[in-house]
Amino acid sequence: MQKILIGMLRTYQGSCLVNGIECKNRTKNFYENIGVDFEFSTMYEKLTARENLQFFSSLYEKKPRPIDELLEAVGLEQDADKRVADYSKGMKSRLNFIKALLHDPVLLCLDEPTSGLDPANSRMMKNMILEEKAKGKTILLTTHNMQDAAELCDRVAFIVNGKICALDSPHNLIMSKGAATVTYTWVENGEHRASCPLEQISSDERLKNLIAKNRLQSIHSSEPTLNDIFMDVTGRTLL
């Protein structure tokens, strides 16, 4: 899908419009409003980060965003003049991301943007994505990370064998799985476990009796996640 949207795949059935332009009939200015962040680095390894960004910004007619500000935003200002070949995978991912922001596009196509990042940099990346979203930009996120999808997306589509099998907001998809449940354990000639829907907890006589007699060993609640929806829709687990 992303290959069609960014004009890489020109042979397809049906219609696909980006900013009112049919993708197969793209013009010279088609990419002025599209930013693409592939999962794997598309940088020139022998150039520095700064040189790469200067080169790619020169390909657009629009005035680029300040390179130093973008580098600082992803924590690469101290390594701006280091060759990309010497960057770690996470550093390349961050550099790839800000390359997509250089020309301030209205459409961002992001492919696994947090892949290879530690928790701190992953959080930073997601905050930047949310900032771009708050500006009114359209963001197409391709990911197997269901936590990212739940945090970042207004709508989530599960695509199986080229077909959309489910499409809705993260909240609605999760609620379609069912309500949260409460699981509790107690000891009586061995350990026992039972569960009940959260909204029915007040009518669970066994649970009320265990609490009254101070015999409850543990209790916790859980609710469905997008991982559960993924497994239901696709019939397979996430790796």
Outline where the language-model segments fall:
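Short, low-complexity, polar/charged sequence segments that are solvent-exposed and flexible
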Residues: D37, F56, M128, G162, ...
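Charged, amphipathic alpha-helical segments
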Residues: C165-L173
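Short, charged/small-residue-rich alpha-helical element at the C-terminal edge
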Residues: N172-L239
